[in-house]
Amino acid sequence: MDQTPAHEQHNHDLLTFIPGDARKIVEVGCSSGALAREYKKINRDCQYIGVEYVPEYAQLAERYCDSVVVADIETIDEEFFQDTLNCDCWIFGDTLEHLKNPWSLLSKIRKFIPDSGSIVACIPNVQHWSVQARLCCGDFRYENSGLFDRTHLRWFTRQTIFEMFNEAGFNIAEGAARDLNEPGRDKILTAIRTMAVSIGADPEMAASDALPLQYVIRAVPA
C-alpha cells in the first residue's frame, strides 16, 4: 500500500463522524497523526491506535497516538484483529483507495467488530465532473495528489461505495458529500445531464453525483 505525503492538517468532516465517546479507535493510514491529535482534544481517554505503512510517518504519529503499528494492514497477522475485538471505531481517511483489496479487508473487520462499532471513511469520488471532462478527451494522467493520485489503486463512486460496504456486511448509517463550488463546472454538468439522458439514466442524479470531490461516511454492522 503506497501512501501520499504526510502533512499536519486533519479532515474536519471526518472528525465529526467519529463517535465522541469511543473507548478504542484504530486509524488505518494515520500518517502524521493529525486526526488523532484533534480527536484527543475531544476524548483524551480513548485508546487511539494508528496503523501506518511508512515508518517515517509512524514516527510522527507516535506524538499523538497511544500506539502505532508499522505494517501493511492487508498483510498484518490475525492476532492484530483479535486484539481489536472491542474496537469502537475504525477510521479510513483517504485510505481505502490505496489498498489492493479493500473489499476483503472490510469483510475481515466485519468478523471482529462489535455490533455497536462503526467504520468512518473518507473516499474520493471518481465520478467527479472534472474526471469525466478529462476522460472525454483521453486525459487520464496520474498526478502527485488529488483524484488522479498515482498511489491510488482503486476508484469509487457513490453507488460503488454503498455496494462495497453492503457486500462486506455493513450499512451506511450517514454520509456527507465534500463539494467545492468550483468554477467552470456548469457547462460540464450540462453535458453530463445530456449524456445521462442518452443512456436512459436520471440526468439530475448524474449531475448530483458529479459534484462531490469526496464522500465521508459512517458504516455500521448490518
What residues fall within each predicted segment?
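Conserved class I S-adenosyl-L-methionine
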Residues: 121-142
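A SAM-dependent methyltransferase catalytic signature shared across enzymes that methylate proteins
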Residues: 161-176
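A structural helix-start
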Residues: 99-100, 123
